[in-house]
From Swiss-Prot:
GO terms for cellular component: ribonucleoprotein complex; ribosome. This is Small ribosomal subunit protein uS8. Coiled coil: none annotated. SUPFAM superfamilies: Ribosomal protein S8 (SSF56047). InterPro entries: Ribosomal_uS8 (IPR000630), Ribosomal_uS8_CS (IPR047863), Ribosomal_uS8_sf (IPR035987). Keywords: Ribonucleoprotein, Ribosomal protein, RNA-binding, rRNA-binding. Part of the 30S ribosomal subunit. Contacts proteins S5 and S12. PROSITE patterns: RIBOSOMAL_S8. GO terms for molecular function: rRNA binding; structural constituent of ribosome. Gene3D superfamilies: 3.30.1370.30, 3.30.1490.10. It comes from Aliivibrio fischeri (strain MJ11) (Vibrio fischeri). One of the primary rRNA binding proteins, it binds directly to 16S rRNA central domain where it helps coordinate assembly of the platform of the 30S subunit. Pfam families: Ribosomal_S8.
Amino acid sequence: MSMQDPISDMLTRVRNGQSANKVAVKMPSSKLKVAIAALLKAEGYIADFAVEGDIKPELEITLKYFQAKPVIEQIQRVSRPGLRVYKKNDALPSVMGGLGIAVVSTSKGLMSDRAARKAGLGGEIICYVA
């Protein structure tokens, strides 16, 4: 069976791993998944990530907890293969009143909604993280 939406699979693995109190989750790697993991680490939502293997690389994400509760309360896919969602810089959403982030794919790469607004860029809304 082929995977239709690898980004949704990644977000689901992170969500399921945190609800099961796992230390880390593994998944097949891609450039986009690594970029999303790097953004989540920079924003403080995950502890670390690493890419292992040469022929079939695997992405391992080390999950982060605070006082035995997951740091990521909500992670939700927005733009999907059947319905792409694009927004201009002035219409980028604010997640949980600015407490969360929207991961935006812009012409300058992946960035948070705050960074995209500051740079004056719009793009595809990949997911919401809070």
